[in-house]
Amino acid sequence: MRSRFDEQLALLNREMIEMGALCEEVIALASKALTEADPELAKKVGPLDAEIDQKERNIESLCLKLLLQQQPVARDLRQISAALKMITDMERIGDQAEDIAEIIQYLAGRSAENDDLLREMALSTIHMVTESVDAYVQRDTMLAETVIAEDDVVDNAFDEVKRRLIDKITAHPEDGAYALDLLMIAKYFERIGDHATNIAEWVIFSVTGVHKEG
C-alpha cells in the first residue's frame, strides 16, 4: 500500500517539476517578446498559459486522489496540501505572463524602454520559480529561504522602473499612456516574484509545518 502511495507521490513531484518548467518557459517567452518588440511572439504565450491551466487541473486531481484513496501521515499530508497551494500560484504566474503578452501586442512593435530592468526582473523570476519547485521536490528549506530573499531584487527593480517612468511622464507627458503600459508590465513581473515567494513559503510549510509569510 505504501509503495503505491510513494509511486503516486513521485508522480506528483514529476508533475510539479513539469508545471514549474512551463512557468519558466512562459515567463521567458513573454520577456523575449518584450525585448524583441514582437507581437507575434507574444501571441504564443496564450497557448502555454492554457497548458499551465491544464497541468493545474491534473495535479489537483492527483492530489485529491492521494487524499481520498490513501491515508497520508502528517508529513505526506503537508506535502500534498502544499502542492495544492503552490499550483494556484503557478497558475497565476501563467496568467500574469499572458497579461504581459497582451500589453506587448497592444504596443504593436514599439520597443520597450528600461528593457534592461524588465529583463532583469524576468530572469530573476524565472530563477525564483526554478528554485522554489526544486526546493519542494528536495524538501530543501534553505533553498526556499533563498527564494524568499531573492524577491527583494525583483522589488528593487520594480521601484527603479517606476521611478524612471515617472520621470519620463514628467518630461514627456505625451508618452504617458506608453509609460503606464510599461509600468503595468513591470508590476506583473513583480507579482510573478510574489507568487514564486508564496511557493517557497509553502515549501517551508510542507517540511516544517510552519507557514512563514514574508
Q: What would you call each of these model-derived segments?
A:
Residues 1-214:
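Cytosolic, long alpha-helical scaffolding segments
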